[in-house]
Amino acid sequence: MRPNAAKPFVRVWKVMEMCYQILLQETRVTQRELFYKLLCDSPHLFPSQTHVNRTIQDLVALLRCSRYSLGIMASSRGLIAGRLTLQEPGKEVVDCSLCGSSGFAISGDLNLLERLVLHADARYVIIVEKHAIFQRLTEDRFFHQIPSILITAKGYPDMATRFLLYRINRAFPDLPILALVDWNPAGLAILCTFKFGSVGMGLEAYRYGSCIIPV
């Protein structure tokens, strides 16, 4: 056996140990936070974020569980704006039409997203590939000219952004979902990731109720 052949197995055990400690503390961490914890604990095993990401995928496949059940939150880049209100039970209502040009940041806590109470008076949901275009549309209050909900992941969608889009589709199945992406292979790939999910998240997507989103 090659000297480094055992490293992937050791990484899995190290991540399991760290997740066990996180769950005992009843906290959640992002993948980035987990990387820094592992970098301090075992720098020779986890020199980069890529090693952590791959090990998490291996662990999810091994245990047949979601990363959230391991205490790992989805990192989210997503923003939402427009004719939609969000309310976590017992908390104040967030009106996404009043969040300014930056929009409302989508939480990476998938349990929280599942609990949100949604209300909308939009006619369309529009996925916007580019963050700059999203900002321009929100500055111009486009969602009042054409009653709509705007959502962006600033490129390829993360799990949290895609899950909120799924929640919106589940709550308002009659709302058409449109996409504003570049007319090139990269834009098509982003559209397909929103619609079908990614290969990398395939082992977990169904656990979050993910389905084919009718974009």
Predicted segments with their positions:
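Nucleic-acid enzyme cleavage-core boundary/entry regions
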Residues: 1-178, 185-215
